[in-house]
A protein has these predicted regions:
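Short, glycine-/Ser/Thr-/acidic-enriched flexible segments
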Residues: 136, 219, 230, 364-365
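N-terminal beta-propeller domains
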Residues: 1-102, 140-179, 327-406
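Small/polar beta-strand repeat architecture
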Residues: 5-21, 97, 101-120, 156-176, ...
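Short loop/turn segments that connect beta-strands within the blades of beta-propeller domains
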Residues: 84-86, 125, 132-135, 207-210, ...
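Hydrophobic residues embedded in beta-strands of well-ordered beta-sheets
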Residues: 88, 138, 148-149, 180-181, ...
Length: 406
């Protein structure tokens, strides 16, 4: 009986599992092979031998594990990073990047020990590469020139945060800006009821609409934090009031004919037509010269009493055409703690998705994906706008950590 041999014309199916031996009923059976070693498969089906390698340089410590990571800015500027025990070195164009006289290898110190290398994951945008590890803060590698490289912690703006507080525990800030002391009424709701710990240092905290980074822990209910730029720990006004109907007059305070209901704005730039919460203060400020010598009364509302401040019948001059209302620093139960910390873990996966820097796979939220503000990779300000940061938790019958993002 004649023997028929099939002509294999392409190998786009790659190596086939031994479990597919004899499965000639599958289309891919005729596009694969049992073993394809040291070959490169072309998109159009053919295969050629892989290119050879050559010795460029010895790694820093040959006895320890080393990991090679590509860093490609474009098709003409491509590097290889040699990650080793607490360092990385750089290679380009078949050689090691060096500097100085005599020349020495450019080396950057890292916090990644040999045991950490296998768990590192990377996402690159132009000259910046983000590096994640489940037990370490997110860092970024930046290239500023051929021989100038840095690796620094990522300074996230306004998040991401855990779910908002739902307990009766309140936080009170001792000041509005700069370095502030924040005191909790109880440990309930903070790190599972254990309160603040030293693992919270470097963690973000959101108090109402202010944001700060924890710099020290005094006790389980007391921390020191630095308010982030352009943020203040002000209590936002609500459009309600407890005093009798209040009007705002602009012009000569002695002339009642000028009284009307002009609106004012609170510290969050929200318009408030009239009324306050308890114990709110009005602060007048201005710059330049007033064309009509406009005057404003500075008043304080306490429950149902309208008082002039600092004393009766005091009129303060101001060239400002707006009034800023700043709430008193009071205990507030509207707070949240940062999602990335030694206490909660750090993301183990990273990628870019639709102009957003995306993280996933923390120890406390293994199935949650964190998306940055669109086009602003290190900004995680949540909101309702189309470009606001997003936090999304996958729903499934098993809770398994997200291992990979693409």
């Amino acid at each position: 009986m004649a023997r028929a041999n099939f002509a294999f014309t392409n190998f786009t199916a790659g190596e086939l599992s031994p479990r597919l031996n004899g499965r000639s009923d599958l289309a891919k059976y005729f596009n694969g092979c049992e073993t394809l070693e040291n070959f490169l498969i072309h998109p159009h089906g053919g295969a050629t031998r892989r290119p050879g390698t050559r010795f460029v340089a010895e790694v820093k410590t040959s006895s320890l594990q080393t990991r090679l990571v590509p860093f490609q800015f474009n098709v003409t500027q491509a590097y290889v990073l040699e990650f080793g025990n607490n360092y990385f070195r750089i290679y380009k164009d078949g050689g090691q990047v060096t500097s100085g006289s005599p020349a020495s290898a450019v080396e950057v110190t890292t916090t990644y020990a040999t045991a950490d290398l296998a768990a590192l994951k990377f996402a690159q945008s132009a000259d910046v590469m983000y590096v994640v590890h489940p037990d370490k803060p997110v860092r970024k590698i930046a290239r500023t020139s051929h021989t100038a490289w840095t690796i620094t912690d990522v300074d996230f703006a306004r998040g991401p945060f855990l779910d908002p507080n739902t307990t009766a525990t309140t936080l009170t800030s001792g000041a509005r800006t700069g370095s502030v002391t924040i005191t909790a009424s109880a440990a309930t709701g903070i790190n599972g009821g254990s309160g603040f710990t030293t693992d919270d240092i470097g963690r973000l905290v959101k108090l109402h609409h202010g944001y700060a980074e924890i710099t020290a822990v005094g006790s389980t209910t007391s921390i020191t934090a630095t308010v982030q730029d352009n943020d203040v720990f002000d209590t936002e006004l609500e459009p309600s009031y407890t005093a009798s109907t209040i009007s705002f007059a602009e012009g000569d305070p002695s002339s009642t004919s000028l009284e009307h209901n002009d609106r004012i704005i609170d510290s969050a730039k929200n318009w408030v037509k009239q009324g306050f919460l308890d114990n709110m203060e009005i602060t007048v400020s201005g710059a330049g010269t007033s064309a009509n010598n406009t005057s404003y009364l500075i008043v304080k509302v306490t429950d149902d009493t309208l008082l002039l401040a600092p004393s009766d019948d005091v009129v303060n001059e101001s060239a400002s055409s707006s009034i800023t209302v700043v709430g008193k620093l009071v205990a507030d139960d509207e707070w949240a703690l940062g999602a990335f910390s030694p206490e909660t873990g750090y993301p183990s996966s990273v990628t870019f998705y639709e102009q957003r820097l995306t993280f996933a796979g923390t120890a406390s939220q293994p199935q949650t994906v964190f998306f940055s503000v669109s086009g602003d990779f290190e900004n995680f300000t949540a909101g309702t706008e189309d470009d606001s940061a997003l936090i999304y938790t996958l729903g499934s019958n098993q809770v398994n950590v997200i291992r990979y993002l693409s």
